[in-house]
Amino acid sequence: MAEDKHGMLRHFLAALAYRTQKALREAPSDFADFEAGNLTRTPRELVQHMTSVLGYARTFFRGGSYRPEPLPSLEGEVERLHEMLADLSAHLAAGDPLVDMTPEQLLQGPFSDAMTHAGQLAMLRRLHGSPVPPEDFIVAEIDRANVGEDQASPRSPDREWPEELP
């Protein structure tokens, strides 16, 4: 995989880590098991699913299969998600070859799927009555070497978009 492609994929994973942490930062304690209705996943289930999707992506580097068992807490699920992000980022940084998948397919499939779920976490925060503060993500401090839980604070909070529910 060319350096520019795997560098961009690592940046995408770092952006995923950032947006996931933004959606979870300062969430109320009962958010983990919030049920929006109509069989939607809870935040804890969403994070588990994100790890599962990314674990599937990892099989194209390592082979095998990946089906994580549910963990009892959102904190445990989040920790496992960031471990998966770190492992994928390490494969990309090392230039490990993908098997039966292109970098573009990795992006359009499991990586984009996981980012969609980060957005769902943010939407669930609003439905829960605790909206995520808006910000201009173009200037967010995203470092492709940082896919951990400790993400930067917003550089440019959007002061013109209402944060409070009507």
Where are these predicted regions, by residue range?
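N-terminal export signals and maturation junctions of secreted/periplasmic proteins
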Residues: 1-5
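Short, contiguous alpha-helical
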Residues: 6, 10-24, 31-69, 98-166
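Helix-adjacent hinge/juxtasegments
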Residues: 59-97
